[in-house]
């Protein structure tokens, strides 16, 4: 007869662990008897020594203090800020290993939560270049203990600024702009905003780059209307940032964590920069919603379009449409496109994007997806295809019931959280919509996030 071995671990204990799995947040999982110990910045196959930081009934959190035997997937860390700033989760392992972790996570969650053990899944769509893909940076500005200006990224789960000169996830132009701004700020006479008091002028440096055109926007978020010596900043940015097309001041006087205020003033250049996505043109302002990884977004949209199976005769309903990018990328293959989005500014962007691209068969409605869909269903709308791209919390069950009553032939579900996806797919099956195929997409390499595209078909067409 086998007896379970019970380990009584407590805070500050030192334990040896073999990492055998990963959590959704990217922490390695090792076991002490029945206790699962979660340790960040480890890889499957690592043997480590860990210090226990916190203990619950069935699990604990630890910190690696020594690497006894490295995993074959472990690589040398190439960023001095890794583990300090909250930007990356997986810089310590090969990109192939990261993709395998993400694909397995989708597979496991669909099985465990949804009960989909044999659902066909295509290999995860990885990035050709897993670094330098982010086309937007929001860099908080602060003061260190020596009263010197710092600028960079927040430490994981905190508002403590890690001073960074560059970021491996961002393009070279951002490093150039950061360097120029830092040197200018030191002698400009502009003071730094302090969250505690709401006093001070410089809040954030906000950068955007258009991947297709190389155009760069530099925006300074200020607690006020402007900055001293703006002309000098423009001159220096123009000299050192080759793709620069726009310098903007954004005014945010609110004592808030929201980065951008509503008022923008163009100091030099154009109000927007221009990019292309899936053959469409987009004009991007500081306030525009836009995909952070343009290249991977194009791959994801191509999969969604393939699953939609449009022939030119369909009514397409795009729920949680944001600025309309997914729906607009399919509009030429549809008879009619209706987009629904709850954020008014995003709806305005969507309408503008359709006008810029001469798309005349699209309309956009501002409203909650579940409520708007119910109204449209009662009005008699019967779309052939519905695309849904909900936030992390997934769909309301009431929306899924409304979709079922609309009786589309196909539903394309774009998910940013495998757990809520699995739950929602289960609800869809109860309404007669069966998932046919799943494709994970790595939209944000080196982070723990994974996107998933699913095709569902109507088993009981009316």
What is the predicted function of each stretch?
Residues 28-33, 152-155, 219-221, 350:
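Short, acidic/hydrophobic/Gly-rich beta-strand patch recurrent on exposed beta strands
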Residues 65-77, 83-192, 212, 227:
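Extended interfacial segments that mediate partner engagement and assembly in macromolecular machines
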Residues 1-81, 363, 371:
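Terminal RNA-binding accessory module
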